Amino acid sequence: MSGENVEVARGLFPPGRELDGPLIAGHPDMVRDLFEPLIAENFSVTFVAAGLTTTNRGPAAMSEATRDYMDAFSEHCSVFDRHIDGGDVVVALGRQHGRAHHGGEFDEETGLVFFFDPNGKLARIQGYQRWREALEAAGLSE
C-alpha cells in the first residue's frame, strides 16, 4: 500500500510543479472534488503561517485550509521536489516563496506530511515550515 500512498501524494502535489496558492484557494469546488474521493471520514488539514495554526476538518478541509493559509500572503507559490515513502505516511519536501502581507518577501523550506489510514485513505495532512520538522513528525530522517 505504501507505493500507492506515494502516488496519491505525488498526484496531489506533483514533483517540480509550481503550485499557485491564491489561484488554488480561489477554486474551492475544484479542490474539494479532487480530494473528496481520497480522504477518510475524519480527514483534517493543519497549516501554520505567520505564527497562526489552523486546522480544518471534513471534505472541504483542504480548500478551507488553503484559503485560510493564503490569507497571510499577497503572493505565494510552492514547489515540492521530493516525496519520501514511510509506509502509512508520506513526506513531501519543497520550497515556498512569495510575499507575506506582513514581513515582505520570503523563500523558505516547506514540508507536508500525509498520514494514511489502514484502508489507504488520507486521514490527515500536516504542514511544516521546516523539512526537519516534517521528517520528525513522520518518524523519518533524510
Regions from the PLM with identified roles:
Residues M1-E142:
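C-terminal and inter-domain tail/linker signature
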